Amino acid sequence: MKPSNFPMPTVDAVLAKYNLNNRYYDFSCGWGVRLLSALKNRVAYFGTDPNYELVARLKQIHQDYDLVNSTISSVDIRATGSEVFHPDWENTMGVAFSSPPYFDLEDYRIGAQSIRGRDYRGWLGEYLQPTIDNIKRYLVPGGHLIVNIKNYGDYALYDDTFSLCESSGLTYVETLILDNITRPSAKQDINTDEKIMVFRHGDTEKSSPLDLFVF
């Protein structure tokens, strides 16, 4: 398995369904697909990524987009990991949605990457847990945390992320299925579908884990 670009139609669908207050936090910015979806859908975009060179390029994408489209978009991207808390974002975000870095798979060598100097348990405790805790503080009541991640190899990334979200007091809502055949690196003869977990900050009627919606 190797990293691949995230399909923009999925981001569009998530924002259409879960955009609560027009403020979207992308906790692992990646190569800009989620940023472009936010720009296209006129949603204020807030992002973190430790790769400072990537952050500079994303800011340039924002400037170029506004120049070409004669728009004034709201974008705030910070060159930190998502485990770093930003007090001015507390209780402001309606939705947090991203595909976080996979342990031992995605290390882009620039900035304070989440895997550096950590084994898997350290990554869970020092990166993923504080990331979830921060997002819970960023979300307004009724806001949603939406995570696209999957188990791979010996690492139960999906299962452990799900457990950490529940133990943090977030309420499970539903599971979406990303038909990953739309990704550039997907192979036609291999099922690479991925689950997208949805949690809510605050009480809600729980869905069954079998209630799936396919993008």
Task: Label the model's feature ranges.
Residues 1-215:
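Class I S-adenosyl-L-methionine-dependent methyltransferase catalytic core
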